[in-house]
């Protein structure tokens, strides 16, 4: 039962030779006494022709869709008048067909998988994964992993696995908890990231580390989130921020070239967090298209339009001509993202009509010049608190992108860095400061003295995000290696010494034993492959994902467990109220 090759490996070297192929029956047709089969494996499709007088005919007549079959025959070029170019110009004339296994009728047609409800696809994931599109996604993922491994191995990195059962520590999301049978009433947590362990490896002297780490976060799900996911996790000793960014650019460029034959221009552009928010309304801006937010606060200060005159910030976005229905839809987007509304104007020569046009007569020339709006185009405004205004108009910017397909004429991929994030952010609900990334991020050396002062909100973090086509695909930082600075960071976020030691005592002890300067990054590997493949969701690039309710419909998880198992763990279950 030895096959000659995978179907996709057949080439002109096999022409007019006997080949043995194995795979699934993609389609079967009877035509004028002939049987035509499409045989499929992970690498491609080939047409098989079975003639009425062939000894293979009786077996071929039994085949149905998704049967597993072995075909032996002559690989030949199809007649010239049937050729269309590519692999379809060749076929196999069968001399022997063997049914290796039968199959039930699938619950959906595999070649129409995109139109099938996602829950059906996930319930029968083993069938969904037979579809060529899904196989392309997972093969791309495999090639990307291989490219990463080759690059990092050649760059002196050591691959180390870190624990899957660890201590529950505050990292932003809820932990998945695992009860300990041997220690009743105590729990492990599944890791949200290997953050502390990779820093401990730097303290241990391993210099450069990486792993494809499985991570777990019990949070609300959306199109690009899963409760269990894969990070490409990396850490380097004796580095500054530029060293990490330079190596990451080389790695990203290598992965794209090795998997997609795409050359990424380097160096990647860098934006500060403030500039990204101020110009694009996002800390992960999609830079494949030019459109940017423009500040026009000064043009309306003291003016008669009260909503703008008193606003901390007035931002404008220029767009092409929009219908009233489209403007209403964009206003809905703005309101969903915190704006009170969306003011607008239409340019008509040297003036404006519609919307708030009666309030802008005297500043029309300056608005036209500053915004760059074309004649007939539309201006969209958001006003109020700076962050709310830019965030709302940033969401509108992306909606306009989708409305006019603004990325179609730009580069297929655009990679950039966002740097200089705030170290801390103030939580209005609790009235306390919290970390923006995690509590081990090093402050900018010029700002560290601001800890504990009224200006600690101005501290810049040595943190950086890697952004691809408007998706954050990586995030990292230079880490705190000085125990005194780490203590100040814990104090800034309201941890008492006892609280800090309860959560991170083992790590605080380790910092006292000669910690080198170090920094690192983690890529959201599922999200990266999603963008590279053009998939609409990370569920399309994970073999066995959960749905958007966190359920595995195929394995029927999560599920109830019996009382005996719970008793053995010392765990009781409260009925939901």
From Swiss-Prot:
It comes from the Bacteria. This is Aspartate--tRNA ligase. Its EC number is 6.1.1.12. The keyword Nucleus does not apply. The keyword Cell membrane does not apply. SUPFAM superfamilies: Class II aaRS and biotin synthetases, GAD domain-like, Nucleic acid-binding proteins. Its main location: cytoplasm. Homodimer. GO terms for biological process: aspartyl-tRNA aminoacylation. NCBIfam families: aspS_bact, PRK00476.1. GO terms for cellular component: cytoplasm. L-aspartate binds at residues 171, 217, 437, 479. Signal peptide: none annotated. Residues 195-198 are annotated as: Aspartate. ATP binds at residues 217-219, 226, 472, 524-527. It catalyses: tRNA(Asp) + L-aspartate + ATP = L-aspartyl-tRNA(Asp) + AMP + diphosphate. Catalyzes the attachment of L-aspartate to tRNA(Asp) in a two-step reaction: L-aspartate is first activated by ATP to form Asp-AMP and then transferred to the acceptor end of tRNA(Asp). Belongs to the class-II aminoacyl-tRNA synthetase family. Type 1 subfamily. It is found in: Cytoplasm. Keywords: Aminoacyl-tRNA synthetase, ATP-binding, Cytoplasm, Ligase, Nucleotide-binding, Protein biosynthesis. PANTHER family: ASPARTATE--TRNA LIGASE, MITOCHONDRIAL (PTHR22594:SF5), ASPARTYL/LYSYL-TRNA SYNTHETASE (PTHR22594). GO terms for molecular function: aspartate-tRNA ligase activity; ATP binding; nucleic acid binding.
